[in-house]
Amino acid sequence: MRRLKIGIRPQLIIIVCFASLFSLLILGIVTGIYFSANLKNLRLERLLVISQLKRTQVQQAIQYIAYQVMTVSEVDSLTVPLSNYRAGNNSKAVFSEAQNYLQQYVLTTDSFTAARLYDLDLQVVASSFDNMTLISESAQDVVYPLQPNRSMPPVLGTPSGLYFTGPIANNSDNFNSRYFMGITVPVLSNSSIILSQPSISGYLTIVAAAESIRSALNSTSEDDYQAMAVQPVYGDPQKGIDNLSQNAYNGDNEVIGFKLVFPVENSLLEAGTIYNINSSSSMKTALASNSGTATGVKSFFGKKVAIGFSRISVQDNLNWSIVIVQSNSVFNGPANKLRKITIGVVIGIGAFMCFVTFPLAVWFIRPITKLKEATEAITKYKKEKLNSVNSNSPTSGSGSGSGSGSGSRANSDSSADQSLSLDTGKRNSINSSSFSSSYSTGIRLPARIPRSKKIFKDELTELSEAFNIMTEELDKQYTHLEDRVKLRTKELEASKIQAEAANEAKTVFIANISHELRTPLNGILGMTSIAMEEEDPNVIHDSLKLIHRSGELLLHILTELLTYSKNTLNRSKLEKSNFQILEIVYQVRSIFNKLAHDQRVNFKILVKPNIFRKLIIYGDSNRIIQIVMNLVSNSLKFTPVDGSVSVSFKLLGEYDHERSKKLDYKKVCILNDSSSSTVAVPPPTPPSDTKPNPKPKSTPTPKPDPTRSHLVDHNNRSANTTSPLTPVRKPTNQTKNKSITNNVTKQNMKIRKKKKTNKNLHNNNNNNKNDNSDFLMNRRLSGSHKFNNTNDEELSPTAIEKNIDKYLTSSADSDNISVTTLSTVQYETTIFESQFKSKPLPALPVDAKPQVSGKIDENDVNDEDPSGGSIKDDDSEDTINEKQGISSSPSSSSSSNEKQENSPRSNDSTTVTVTRPRHNMMPSAQDFKSYPTFDKKPEYDSNMSNNEIVKNNRVYRIRNMYQPKVWVIQIEVTDTGPGIEPALQEKVFEPFVQGDQTLSRSYGGTGLGLSICRQLATMMHGTLTLKSTIGKGSTFTLTLPLPQTGEIMVPPEDMAEFCEDEFNPAAKINRKVAFEDGDIDTESQQQENPSSEEDTQGDRNVQSSTSSSPPNSSSTDSALPASDSSDIGGTNKSKTTSHGNNKNINAKKRIITNSSASSTKGTKRHTNNDGGGGVNGNHSDDNKDLTLTIDKPSLFTRGSTGTANSGTTSSHSDKKILYPTPTTTTTTTTTTDHTTVLDDISHLRVLVAEDNSVNQEVISRMLKQEGITNLTMACNGAKAIDFVKESIENNENFDLIFMDVQMPEVDGLKATKMIRKNLQYNKPIIALTAFADESNVKECLNSGMSGFITKPISKTNIKKVLVEFLSNEVVTS
């Protein structure tokens, strides 16, 4: 089919005309829309600027009036009469000067028309008004807010309060009536020269004319816009307007209406009339935000308007919005005019283009015609040339290489030439059939142009394929771009959903945290007001307790918020040190045993495998304790009565750092574990285990032979499969293996023999398990102090420590902490107590022998060190007080000053009690304040500098790891609570999210605890996960990689005893049996000597469930009936009795009978008063008198009843256990001093440098309660330096200085440096700081301070500081 030919000239004319018109149309539309939008935006910005200018004018006018009023309120003519009146001068003449001043002020100013001066009873004591301007009665009721029958606005209760009333028209019926507004401010005066801060003595109300404010709102052109001052009206949509909150924002109400402050000309809205907020979308928009613009909104009368608004922010009750209103017709007038101009221009240009296109087309087509003719000529010549070449080429393919090549090229050219044919009969035509496709380019399309079906063709047809290729490429790019846009859209939608969820969570959090913050504040304010009106000291004391607990709760909430923010900003740092896992275990148990007992929750702690106890690991133990405390406290909070909470500490295996790093530490991987799970096979069972630990199904491990487990030699590494360590050096001799099977068999026979005997005896004890005397006794004692074993007659350092302990456990210490603030207080207490101890773990000397013997022979004991019983062995200097009666007196070695202690252990092992300096003691449960408990000595005594540790009176050496290994530990906290929904199990780790997000939730909290725990776990490259089942409970799993830096060298024969504690499920202490002392021989006593924290260092027998124990003991099963070998009634009575005599105990070693062994039925234990104990003291039989040294605070829990001091016979008839008195002491002493070391410290001089008067009062009263009366107060660092300098010059040095860190003039750090360097002051300086952070603590200590106390200041911390730093001063004095 032949195509109809149309020349390029007509096509060009049509295309140019169409293109010009179409382009102009597009340009006109785009330009019109763009410039119209810009013009509207400029108009809106104009309205906004006008509203901001009006707002500024009004605000400046109001502030100017307020400034004048505040200036008047500070005039002496007003403040002095009020101060005199408040001081008691009630004469009428006292306010005459104020009356004259107000009258003169009102008459001489045009802005003010009236004034009133009120006293604190809101009675008018002076008033003045302008006779020329009379204020109507209705207006006076509004502008004068203070009346006796009205409540005073809360804002006036603050010294800087400012309260506005009005404006109100003097005559509401007259449009031009004057407007007045009242400004009320408190009048401050200082009625006493003692007080530095002025107080509120009265109030001043001045009525000012509001004409200056009204004039600022007048518009220059009424036809252009209207300026309105709009005041929102708050209230409940259901109940209506709240008249009390019309002038102030109330968070519980919302804007339900509005009213005009001043009338507006040419407006039907009346000033002072309240209109519904929904009746005008323009006002609703204006009152919804502080400033902005809006178009297309409707006015009160339904007309579309454009507005610009800005809100005034002067005071809470003055929240006007300045609204500039412009009608839609006026606002869109310039844009409509621009649109008409654009349309006219487009039509004119289109007509002009059509007129000039025809002659231009004729002229422009000539080059194209010439080019076509030249192309046709070239094509014709090429075709003829190719035909001649084809005719001359050979027909055969054979011939020379040249001929073959020519023939090939000729055939190729011929075949190519056949694709072109020249139509010589027609003009301006080219046959393009050789192309596979030919598309029309009549219009430009973004897609591939199909082959044209037109009946004509032109020169542009050949360009269609190239265009289509380009179009295909563009199509690919557009498609790829569209996919990317869709992907970005999905990401934006996901981000939007996530942001909405976060906003919703924050909204719920704000509601919840408001309740959490107001709850303690309500307790503080309410109980304060109650205590101020009470006269009963007991009621006041109870009120103060509640105030203290509420303050701790508030501190806990704020600390969690600050901790989360600090972790989010990556400002938290890990404070790593060497520690043993039992340190964490004992602290957790000490903290939560009492809480679980009170809640009747079975609380258990397990450590497995037993070899875990031998590891010295390196990490931030405080952060680990913080995580575990948070998890355990959450479990106890949600676990019901008779439920259970268990904490298990597991050693999983060696850490695979490479795999964990590849996973970005999202999981903690273990070596030789093919799966990505963090669960791995635990190490083989250590010697003391009776059954293998459970292993995961995925990685089976052969069960170790229990008969060979306790025959493993530590020095024989080829046979040792339980130790995770590699040898440091080859030992010189082998340790002989020894089995304890025979001993265990004998012991089991005795267990069965005595089980029946004790059955009835334990049942009788059940009736006394809830005696309140033990609980009251526990609440009056503090369990956070250290003890040392010594028999010193003089005030040696160890004797001082004993008296210090007595001082700390006095009944005056009532600083009981709150359950709710447990974790916060514990962590801050850990930081506080870190100044009293350090735990270095130096490298083991090259020539040192890895001695692991726990037996010290008498021949190894040499001369004592004067520091309080220090003796030397072959390798190191140890402070050892042998149980057989090794003398510890620094001044005499005679036997008269020695004490014999009877040990129930066998003769083949010497039991020793090792006393260490306080700074070398390994922290244990008593080092952290939890619930007040009995004072006991730490379970562990370590001397890290000598690389040794003491447990159960046995000395074990610590070997350093020269190639430390990194182990994976797992801490699981499992409870039987209600569980967490699956949808929330991952969200609970997000900030501000809780398991119960409703406002009716049963438990409080900020929703940040678990988030902080996961942050801390992530900082340590660990994980924190949750598994929970609704109705069954939850399990939180903390998995951490921690490097091992050392190992406690325990011989295989001592491994069973070393692992004998309540945290070992296979330990003897957890067996449900009891013994009577009369039938237990020395051998069985040695085998049944557990190492739990509740056991004392003397006679320790395996106990059954005690009758006084709660269902939360970590060592027994709550399902079994409770029983005990001690009479709890007698124990409780003795605790109450002995507490009264606690202050009369001599400053000597405390001797106490173990309540779990010494108070058994039918057994008598007498203290040894013969005084004949020497170095070679005789061991007493089990039926003879036994003495026992109290270890540490005994928690009143199952597995260990409360321990009571006993200096008399434990009788079965009266069932009383008494503390030793001076007449029944177990030591032969010649001293008659019955006072403690710190009983008389009134002579000591103390300087307190504190700038805050309240803090000065607090610390001064606390120090006076402790007996220090010679106090000197300094308000800044410069004063403190002057006082110290003056005391040194007068030879009356201060014994102790409390230095605040932040003070004016000279801060505490700089002052300390100057005192230390310039004045050579060498006495203790204690920092008082509110920033309880490790970095701040280090800065304080580096500046020369001796210690620190964090604010809020605690009496317990004050006591500890006095004990630590004033003991030497007391002894010297």
Curated annotation (Swiss-Prot):
The source's superkingdom equals Eukaryota
Residue ranges for the region (Disordered) are 387-440, 675-777, 841-933, 1080-1230
Top enzyme category: transferase
Question: Ranges of Pro residues compositional bias?
Answer: 681-704
Q: Where is there biased composition of kind Low complexity?
A: 387-397, 407-440, 760-770, 887-896, 1104-1118, 1197-1211, 1221-1230
Q: Which GO terms describe its molecular function?
A: ATP binding; histidine phosphotransfer kinase activity; metal ion binding; osmosensor activity; phosphorelay sensor kinase activity; protein histidine kinase activity
Q: Which GO terms describe its biological process?
A: cell wall organization; cellular response to farnesol; filamentous growth of a population of unicellular organisms in response to biotic stimulus; filamentous growth of a unicellular organism; osmosensory signaling via phosphorelay pathway; phosphorelay signal transduction system; positive regulation of filamentous growth of a population of unicellular organisms in response to biotic stimulus
Q: What is this protein called?
A: Histidine protein kinase SLN1
Recorded E.C. number(s)?
2.7.13.3
Taxon lineage = Eukaryota, Fungi, Dikarya, Ascomycota, Saccharomycotina
| KW Glycoprotein (keyword) present | yes
Q: How does it sit in the membrane?
A: Multi-pass membrane protein
